[in-house]
């Protein structure tokens, strides 16, 4: 061990070859430890709603407005502060409007630049100069650094800053400078972003959200059930491919696949129009508002039915191939009496709402027709060979996982599978039993195998496991006894649609259970929390996102308009800054145009979950622990230099 430690110190001495350099680094790191911790922003359940997501990202769930309030307090009217905040969110668009209304743009530029500089100073104050420098736009890096850095040696600071601002306006770079300052404020306001699941689902722009996240300065992702579904589809898993297309068709968003990812759906469309030519497909109507022509709508509905039937067949094959999944009860096609148009479920007969199944052979209901097989082969190749989709999924794999422990918070989407008594449920995965953290880790390992395993069998298991995670009752990302897709389409009886939730959801107020979950993931003591995405909080019914005395924070971003009628709000986001935890409840997002024109913001109400007595500093964070280890190693190196065990390289 001593030899290993000495070799490590020798390697460290190559980076810090002198006492002076090692000492300077210790001083620098110690200074960083004393800075306030950076602001963390938690978003979840974005569901493809790009506009609302982009707005929340720009305003930091109210963090930008709080900075404006902190800087200007009562010296500026609420209306002016909101106008300044809107400018920071949408600098280009806001300036286009101002130019139409303002008579003296030079004065407006001057006032606005001074205000933005003050906000930028406040926002940058919690970071090292080095970190701020890395965030500066190249074109204006030097000038911005001059403007936001205090210069004690200047006797006439006002004159110095005035000259810089006047020059910016004189050379007609004010607009570009305002944009640069606004984007810098946005970036510095949030130090790190957590996406607690479900970038994908029913909304029209998940691919745009992924592009945005790939440009974000610091982000991690906890996969949601819909994210896993898309990952499985990208890996070529047929059950996942069929589900992805069905959900896009159901919400009138097939253009995500066709335009966003360039996946050719023409063979499916041709097949659907041929096989269901005279079928109104009434059970497969589109959800949400769409702007289709009658002809386009008819085609989407027929495609919706065609891919749904293919899905039920393909899933039947997966279930038969994987008896260990214990999902035989979800194979329903062989229970249909095709002559009578009924189905037998749990000994009870139900009449089907749709009785037209031209592609199902009653003797072999799970066998794809030659045309269906050809369609699935083409789709499988299309998903596997789509460069943009593969790039997005690699990003999810690189930045994501099923859970994350970060600064004493446990982040995950969905639930921890529990028994009725609150103990952790034992789940069998390919012959071995797992529970709690081990279950998460083995499932995540299979997801990665589905993309990267060299052995064909392991790769196939990994792909099938992504489909399992999407809809199995023992999956942490699903947590219900069944996914009643077939019943919702074909049966009128609501009792057949019921999906019973895992006991986890009814035990979130049980402190013993919550503490056992936190302990399972290595967390104990004060100021520890579970941040849980996936479940909409029905605020209009008096439901609270704060559970178990503040130990559990159930946040669903509520970006999906479909849930907003149920919940009464547009969901919650969470901010964790140096002063504590703040939950923000959002009003529904009207539009980007309304946000710019009216200055309307979607954050409506903030709830302080926990206010810390002493301001949290970097030394209190995970980064702080790593920096302390680095300081300790450097102090060992200094000791080795001073004792003569290692010689300085001067």
Predicted features along the sequence, with ranges:
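Feature recognizes metal-dependent phosphohydrolase scaffolds
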Residues: 1-650
């Amino acid at each position: 061990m001593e030899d290993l430690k000495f070799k490590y110190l020798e390697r460290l001495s190559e980076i810090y070859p002198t006492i002076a350099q090692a000492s300077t680094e210790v001083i620098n790191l110690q200074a960083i430890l004393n800075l306030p911790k950076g602001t963390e922003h938690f978003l979840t359940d974005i569901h493809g709603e790009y506009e609302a997501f982009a707005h929340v990202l720009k305003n930091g769930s109210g963090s930008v407005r709080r900075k404006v309030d902190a800087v200007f307090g009562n010296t500026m009217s609420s209306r002016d502060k909101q106008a300044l905040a809107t400018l920071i969110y949408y600098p280009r668009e806001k300036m286009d409007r101002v130019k139409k209304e303002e008579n003296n743009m030079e004065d407006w530029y001057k006032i606005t630049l001074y205000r933005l500089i003050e906000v930028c100073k406040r926002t940058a104050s919690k970071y090292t100069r080095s970190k701020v420098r890395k965030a500066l736009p190249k074109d204006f890096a030097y000038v911005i650094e001059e403007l936001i850095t205090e210069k004690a040696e200047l006797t006439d600071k006002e004159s110095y800053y005035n000259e810089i601002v006047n020059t910016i306006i004189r050379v007609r770079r004010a607009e570009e400078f305002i944009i640069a300052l606004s984007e810098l404020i946005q970036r510095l306001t949030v130090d790190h972003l957590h996406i607690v699941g479900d970038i994908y689902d029913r909304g029209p722009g998940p691919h745009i959200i992924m592009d945005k996240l790939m440009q974000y300065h610091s982000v991690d992702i906890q996969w949601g059930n819909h994210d896993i579904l898309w990952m499985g589809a990208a890996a070529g898993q047929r059950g996942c491919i069929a589900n992805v297309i069905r959900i896009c068709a159901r919400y009138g968003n097939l253009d995500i696949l066709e335009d966003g990812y360039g996946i050719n759906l023409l063979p499916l469309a041709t097949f659907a129009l041929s096989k269901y030519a005279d079928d109104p497909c009434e059970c497969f109507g589109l959800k949400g508002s769409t702007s289709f022509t009658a002809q386009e709508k008819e085609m989407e509905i027929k495609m919706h039915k065609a891919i749904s039937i293919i899905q039920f067949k393909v899933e039947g094959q997966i279930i038969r191939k994987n008896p260990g999944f214990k999902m035989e009860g979800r194979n329903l096609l062989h229970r249909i009496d095709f002559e009578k148009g009924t189905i037998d479920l749990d000994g009870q007969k139900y009449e089907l709402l749709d009785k037209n199944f031209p592609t199902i052979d009653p003797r072999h209901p799970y066998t794809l027709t030659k045309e269906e097989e050809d369609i699935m082969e083409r789709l499988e190749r299309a998903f596997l060979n789509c460069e943009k989709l593969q790039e997005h999924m690699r990003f999810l794999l690189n930045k994501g996982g099923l859970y994350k422990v970060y600064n004493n918070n446990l982040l995950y989407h969905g639930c921890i599978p529990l028994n009725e008594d609150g103990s952790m449920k034992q789940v069998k995965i390919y012959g071995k039993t797992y529970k709690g953290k081990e279950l998460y880790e083995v499932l995540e390992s299979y997801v990665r195998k589905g993309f990267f395993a060299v052995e064909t069998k392991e790769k196939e298991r990994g792909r099938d496991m992504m489909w399992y995670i999407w809809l199995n009752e023992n999956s942490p990302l699903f947590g219900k006894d069944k996914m009643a897709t077939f019943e919702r389409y074909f049966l009128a009886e609501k009792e057949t649609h019921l999906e019973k939730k895992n006991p986890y959801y009814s035990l979130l107020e049980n402190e013993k259970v919550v503490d056992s979950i936190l302990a399972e993931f290595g967390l104990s003591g004060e100021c520890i929390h579970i941040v849980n995405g996936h479940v909409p909080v029905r605020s209009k019914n008096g439901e609270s996102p704060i559970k178990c005395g503040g130990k559990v924070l159930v946040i669903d971003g509520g970006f999906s308009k479909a849930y907003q009628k149920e919940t009464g709000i547009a969901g919650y986001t969470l901010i964790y800054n140096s002063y504590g935890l703040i939950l923000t409840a959002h009003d529904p997002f009207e539009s980007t145009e309304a946000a710019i024109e009216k200055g309307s913001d979607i954050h409506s109400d903030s709830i302080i979950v926990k206010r810390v007595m002493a301001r949290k500093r970097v030394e209190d964070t995970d980064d702080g622990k790593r920096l302390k280890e680095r300081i300790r190693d450097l102090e060992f190196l200094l000791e080795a230099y001073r004792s003569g065990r290692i010689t300085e390289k001067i």
